[in-house]
């Protein structure tokens, strides 16, 4: 599976809320030798694939043109809506 991601320029609660209202959500990629990167993902693209087992075995994120193989590490979900609030990915 391959998903497009964009590096986040704005950080904080207000910026994250604006992303969620726009149908996106914040995430972070960390691990390995490289520094952690804050990214933005399209909510519907990710949520539609999260019920498949291969999603949790490893996916490819295209972050500003560079492909990074990652695995979901943590998912924060909304309390009662079927929405993802934030995700952590670890490089593999």
Swiss-Prot record:
Listed name of the protein: Large ribosomal subunit protein bL25
UniProt KW Phosphoprotein keyword: no
Subunit-structure text: Part of the 50S ribosomal subunit; part of the 5S rRNA/L5/L18/L25 subcomplex. Contacts the 5S rRNA. Binds to the 5S rRNA independently of L5 and L18.
Keywords linked to the UniProt accession: Ribonucleoprotein, Ribosomal protein, RNA-binding, rRNA-binding
Gene3D superfamilies found in the cross-reference section: Ribosomal Protein L25, Chain P
Pfam families: Ribosomal_L25p
GO molecular function: 5S rRNA binding; structural constituent of ribosome
Purpose of the protein: This is one of the proteins that binds to the 5S RNA in the ribosome where it forms part of the central protuberance.
GO biological process: translation
Domain of life: Bacteria
GO cellular component: cytosolic large ribosomal subunit
InterPro entries linked to this entry: Rbsml_bL25/Gln-tRNA_synth_N, Ribosomal_bL25/Gln-tRNA_synth, Ribosomal_bL25_short, Ribosomal_L25_dom, Ribosomal_uL5_bac-type
């Amino acid at each position: 599976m391959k998903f497009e991601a964009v590096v986040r320029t704005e950080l904080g609660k207000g910026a994250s809320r604006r992303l969620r209202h726009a149908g996106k959500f914040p995430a972070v990629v960390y691990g390995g030798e490289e520094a952690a990167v804050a990214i933005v993902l399209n909510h519907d693209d990710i949520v539609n694939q999260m019920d498949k087992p291969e999603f949790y075995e490893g996916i490819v994120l295209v972050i500003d043109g560079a492909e990074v193989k990652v695995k979901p590490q943590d998912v924060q979900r909304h309390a009662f809506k079927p929405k993802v609030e934030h995700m952590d990915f670890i490089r593999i």
